[in-house]
Amino acid sequence: MTPNESLDRFHRQLNARHLSNTTHSNYHLWVSRFFEYCRPDDVSELTIDDAQDFLLNLSENYDYADRTYNVAVDAIRSFFELVLHIHGSGKEFLKRKVSVVQKNPITPDQALTLLESCQDPMLKAAIALGFGCGMRIEEIVTLKVVNIHKGSRFITIENSKGNKTRTVKYSLSAMEILQNYCRIRGITSASKDSYIFPSEKKSGDHMSCSVLSYTFRNYLQTISFYLPDQTFHGLRHAFATSLANRNVPLPVIQKLMGHQSAATTAFYIHTPQEEPDELPDLLVREK
């Protein structure tokens, strides 16, 4: 089996499992790099030792972030299991331990400051969708005109995480910011298949996540509360925290975030965890 034939089979297997386009792209990248490293004529001759050599090479010679390295591990392990039918153990495809604590998440008040101070209509619209609707960065850059329903004020998100379709609501304020940006860009409701955030380099394509992330990071550096580990994804933390501060129930926040688990949603909520001086008397009705 040639490398190209095996990649085609790999993508068919990923499609059958309804994995997202982002996962497809990442897995394709890492398996392709694995082939460049091993240069196999027949991929069926590849072994787990080859995979381990490749992953060791990544660890020893490249300074990839832990999460990026773990994506590479997942990609190679999935390829071996789905295409070569070789099942390695967790010890053979060892992933790095990643801290799940964001040290300096963007607070709701900071997110509002970012929105109010932003002079770039494109970035302001993206921030409004990230903080005001809780949308992921990849959901924002792939948003099309047809996905925005002005009458009922909701957005349809196709190919969301897990290759699912979900809907999110948006406020009048978010609508005004988005409409202002579209007016400046000349984006109209007639161009239904057009991207809201088009690529500046490739006609007909959408802006990449890296471009939006880079623009946001540069903007953050002009703000007084900037810290290096703050990212565009922090706006989702601010979205969840802001809803929790307004007493929106956790299951509702979970649905709006598009999470399968309430535990995942709870991780996004950053509220003071101070214990009360006295335990409330739960045996007496509140007046």
PLM region spans:
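Conserved catalytic core of the tyrosine transesterase superfamily
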Residues: 1-287
